[in-house]
């Protein structure tokens, strides 16, 4: 069942704004920011997790320091597509560490992959040994990221 934002009150929205910006806060620190005691704050945050508003907590790593700073968006077109082929492609892509994001898209192409590797040579290896080996792909168009102009991990609430 899909939830809607109308079931949240202003305190819930405050919690979402704050943890989206800094998920490392302790419950006590979060409680101070929203002017509630610790127990109700803890219960609200856990409820937001159970309801699916908070999907998880992550550390954002520096891609360059992790030798994953060579970023490419791949527009993948399939020769044919059906449920079996789509499921197989999704399962295969999920196993590739180089792919950090994968979207089923409309328009020109069927999938958009975000690939993060250390170099052009590693990208070529990925294309030849992984993506290029998947049957039913008719075309891969690569878009190399020269600079990141905007990168956010949240959105306005």
Predicted regions and their residues:
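A compositional/biophysical signature of low hydrophobicity enriched in polar/charged and small residues
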Residues: 1-157
């Amino acid at each position: 069942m899909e939830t809607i934002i109308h079931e949240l009150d202003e305190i819930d929205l405050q919690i979402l704004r704050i943890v989206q910006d800094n998920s490392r806060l302790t419950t006590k620190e979060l409680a101070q920011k929203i002017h509630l005691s610790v127990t109700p704050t803890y219960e609200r945050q856990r409820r937001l997790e159970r309801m699916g508003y908070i999907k998880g907590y992550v550390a954002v790593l520096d891609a360059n320091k992790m030798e994953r700073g060579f970023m490419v968006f791949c527009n993948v077109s399939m020769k044919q597509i059906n449920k079996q082929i789509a499921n197989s492609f999704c399962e295969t892509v999920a196993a590739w560490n180089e792919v950090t994001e994968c979207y089923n898209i409309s328009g020109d192409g069927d999938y958009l992959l975000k690939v993060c590797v250390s170099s052009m040579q590693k990208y070529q290896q990925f294309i030849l040994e992984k993506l290029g080996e998947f049957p039913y792909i008719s075309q891969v168009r690569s878009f190399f990221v020269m600079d990141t102009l905007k990168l956010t991990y949240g959105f306005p609430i």
